[in-house]
Amino acid sequence: MSDNLSQADILARVAATLESRKPENGGDPEKSYVAKLFKKGDDAILKKIGEEATETVMAAKDARAADLADEAVSKVVYEVADLWFHTMVLLARIGRTPEDVVNELARREGLSGLVEKASRKE
């Protein structure tokens, strides 16, 4: 990570890039993987998130089986990055940003997980 960019800056830059890849913003599915996902629609994006979530779970299981060897843990980080990226594509698709997720995490910070879960509307 660049010394001049914060983690929030990087998320914001990725979000801006995703926004620019939307068809209504000139994203070209012939030149951009993300534009192609947007063109294919929600089901393609959700399928990709499911695939990346499964790959993350499998990498985590492999890392544990490898006694958390550096290479195996690096694979988990790699897969989580793919998962985050594709969930960011979904967020862009529904008009939200990583900032919205960070705000939700900030709202939950310090709350008991049980209290937070009980407060959810069914």
Swiss-Prot record:
Checking Pfam families in the record gives: PRA-PH
Q: Which GO terms describe its cellular component?
A: cytoplasm
**Entry's localization field:** Cytoplasm
Q: Which GO terms describe its biological process?
A: L-histidine biosynthetic process
Molecular function terms, GO-annotated: ATP binding; phosphoribosyl-ATP diphosphatase activity
Gene3D superfamilies given in the database record: MazG-like (1.10.287.1080)
UniProt-listed InterPro entries: HisE (IPR008179), PRib-ATP_PPHydrolase-like (IPR021130)
Q: Which keywords does this Swiss-Prot/TrEMBL entry list?
A: Amino-acid biosynthesis, ATP-binding, Cytoplasm, Histidine biosynthesis, Hydrolase, Nucleotide-binding
Q: Which reaction does it catalyse?
A: 1-(5-phospho-beta-D-ribosyl)-ATP + H2O = 1-(5-phospho-beta-D-ribosyl)-5'-AMP + diphosphate + H(+)
* Pathway connected to this protein: Amino-acid biosynthesis; L-histidine biosynthesis; L-histidine from 5-phospho-alpha-D-ribose 1-diphosphate: step 2/9
Which class of enzymes does this protein belong to?
A: hydrolase
Q: EC number(s)? A: 3.6.1.31
Q: Which PANTHER family match?
A: HISTIDINE BIOSYNTHESIS BIFUNCTIONAL PROTEIN, HISTIDINE BIOSYNTHESIS BIFUNCTIONAL PROTEIN HISIE
Q: Which family, according to the similarity comment?
A: Belongs to the PRA-PH family.
The molecule here is called: Phosphoribosyl-ATP pyrophosphatase
